[in-house]
Amino acid sequence: MHTFLIVLLIIDCIALITVVLLQEGKSSGLSGAISGGAEQLFGKQKQRGVDLFLNRLTIILSILFFVLMICISYLGM
């Protein structure tokens, strides 16, 4: 059981890294807020399509990561 959870954790880590790297970068970061890009920073920006899917998948994989880590820690005691 412990080995199975570790294999799942490795798969989850690889998937999480891949999904994060596939996401589109936010072009107006701190420099955009300072230099007058505040309307883009504070305005409503809806995510659509692939961006929305990748964002939700990142959240799901992150939750799975923490659940697997807690289970592995619990079984290790």
From Swiss-Prot:
Pfam families found in the cross-reference section: SecG
Main location: membrane
Cellular component GO terms, alphabetical: plasma membrane
Record keywords, A-Z: Cell membrane, Membrane, Protein transport, Translocation, Transmembrane, Transmembrane helix, Transport
Transmembrane segments: 2-22, 57-77
Compartmental location: Cell membrane
Biological processes per GO annotation: intracellular protein transmembrane transport; protein secretion; protein transport by the Sec complex
GO-annotated molecular function: protein-transporting ATPase activity
Membrane-topology annotation of the record: Multi-pass membrane protein
Family: Belongs to the SecG family.
UniProt function note: Involved in protein export. Participates in an early event of protein translocation.
PANTHER family: PROTEIN-EXPORT MEMBRANE PROTEIN SECG
Protein name in UniProt: Probable protein-export membrane protein SecG
Species for this entry: Staphylococcus aureus (strain COL)
Gene this chain is encoded by: secG
